[in-house]
Amino acid sequence: MKEPVSSIQAPSRHAKIDFTRQWQNFVLGFQHLLAMYSGDVLVPLLIGHYLHFSTLQMTYLVSIDIFMCGVATLLQLKRTPLTGIGLPVVLGCAVQAVTPLETIGGKLGITYMYGAVIAAGIFVFLIAGFFARLKKFFPPVVTGSLITIIGFTLVPVGFQDLGGGTPTAASFGDPANLLIGFLTIAIILLFNAFARGFMKSIAILLGLLISSFIAGALGFVSLKPVSEAAWFHAPQLFFFGVPRFDMSAMITMILVSLTTMIESTGVFFALSDITGRQLTTNDLERGYRAEGIAAILGGLFNTFPYSTFSENVGVLKMSGVKSRQPVYYAAFLLLLLGLLPKVGALATVIPEPVLGGAMIVMFGMVGVQGVQILHKVDFSNNANLLTASVSIGLGLGITMYPQLFQHMPTEFQIILGNGIVVTSLSAVLLNLLFNHRWANHD
């Protein structure tokens, strides 16, 4: 008589455990969402304002962007024979594309802007196999340098938000901004140091929420974006018109896509190191293809190219949860928020100092992940020492002074004005020079 009772009770117990785990995954996914949300919606806002979009156009642009972030993320999460790297990666608008797209849209028109995005997506899809085979040129001295520079060059973005967002504004650096920003950092650190289990893994989310409530009590939160947003918005093909194509615009966006592929490579290797999963050439190929398809869909639905978000590497590192399940929840939440702009607008009311404090922690974690990879490198070998030091030095310098190449053609500025790209190119070339060519002559 006891055996049937036990067979009935066991499923109930397992169902409860599964429900708890799924709830925790949902909350972790929400943490991933908040980490990338403001950085993502910034891209359509910047481009829309530059091109003088109407309120209706801006509403569509932000909504479809959020929706397509969910689509792009799902493309990467699920490994298929064609696409998907299968790592816990979140995709968002490629911020490197902002200035080129503004230039194309301003000079040629909106439809040419989307034609260039589609062309860049097709290019990424077609060269995915070739680019993936360059994996052998990314040993730890190269990937470590690249991931270090990705993290540390983005830390100033966090400080800018912590100060209030716009350095030229009179309120920038206001003591209230600094108090809220550093309070966010303190809350994240306290939960990470003293909390246990699940509460520790959502330290960033708790820091964002608690600091936002405090900031709201101090009058830093405005719900105007929520009241102005529509309740529902459906994705629509060719909302701004059928894409048109111009050779110079397409070449410009293809160059931008190369820079995003290089940055994505760094993020892929960072996630590989965190999760302990070795990446194959086929993995990388599927990952690049997913980004190519996401860009093509972006052009068709009149939005933008998409790339991996390094913020979420910091979230993953901090939480210690390496599963893809939370990111699936983040992707589905993005789809939902893209359809319900009024709900999605809630995430935009988080004050900039709060986001800045969280960004400093997240980007710092990404940089330290790169340092951990460099720890595996034999620096008693001067070739490795020179490769890392020169590459990181060039990346930091160009990040501080991107105008260094302002007198060069635009095509060169896109490549050489990006510290992450320069670090990657420098590390690959110096590693080949020192560790291969010269080694063969010893």
Question: Residue spans of the language-model regions?
Answer:
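Hydrophobic, small-residue-rich membrane helices and short re-entrant helix-turn-helix hairpins
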Residues: 194-206, 231-240, 249, 266-289, ...
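Intrinsically disordered, low-complexity non-transmembrane regions of multi-pass membrane transporters
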Residues: 1-28, 223-238, 273-277, 287, ...
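Juxtamembrane interface elements at the cytosolic ends of transmembrane helices
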Residues: 2-9, 40-44, 48, 184-194, ...
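Membrane-embedded helical hairpins/re-entrant loop segments and their flanking transmembrane helices
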Residues: 13, 22, 48-84, 252-324
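N-terminal signal-anchor module of multipass membrane proteins
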Residues: 2-89, 96-104
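Hydrophobic, membrane-embedded alpha-helices of multi-pass small-molecule transporters
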Residues: 23-36, 40, 173-185, 202-203, ...
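Short, non-helical or kinked segments that cap or interrupt transmembrane helices
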Residues: 60, 82-95, 136-145, 199-205, ...
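Membrane-embedded alpha-helical modules
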Residues: 104-222, 331, 336-441
